[in-house]
């Protein structure tokens, strides 16, 4: 089974670190995966609209210029007809409660 993952973070250096970590982890646990990296929530949502039900997991940064991770997650929930695992990556504790309602 192929695990399809989207990761969205406007900070490219953070994105590279997380991408490298995911690559190492998936190889270590022997899971076949595909990882797409986005620097814009708008671009991620455009691709989700085009390819409904494509991603199994979405990793979102909370603070981005075009929209925050909560807004992106809410739109993904509206667009995708099946359950997608959404995980937020942030150092802002004030977003913790908000993330549970998505």
Where are these regions (language model features)?
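Acidic, metal-coordinating helix/loop segments flanking the phosphotransfer/catalytic sites
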Residues: 19, 37-57
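Short, well-ordered amphipathic alpha-helices
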Residues: 15-25, 44-45, 72-77
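Conserved acidic segment of CheY-like receiver
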Residues: 3-23, 58
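Cofactor-binding loop segments of dinucleotide-utilizing enzymes, especially the Rossmann-like FAD-
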Residues: 10, 40, 91
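Conserved SAM-binding loop
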Residues: 7, 37, 88-89
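A general structural signal for stabilizing positions within well-ordered secondary structure
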Residues: 27-29, 49, 78
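A generic structural motif
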Residues: 26-35, 82-84
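CheY-like receiver
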Residues: 46, 54-102
């Amino acid at each position: 089974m192929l695990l399809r993952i989207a990761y969205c973070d406007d900070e490219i250096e953070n994105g590279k670190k997380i991408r490298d970590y995911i690559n190492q982890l998936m190889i270590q646990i022997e899971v076949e995966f595909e990882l797409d990296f986005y620097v814009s929530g708008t671009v991620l949502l455009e691709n989700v609209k085009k390819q409904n039900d494509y991603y199994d997991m979405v990793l979102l940064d909370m603070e981005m210029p075009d929209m925050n991770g909560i807004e992106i997650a809410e739109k993904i929930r509206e667009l995708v007809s099946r359950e997608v695992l959404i995980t937020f990556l942030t150092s802002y504790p004030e977003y913790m409660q908000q993330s549970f309602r998505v």
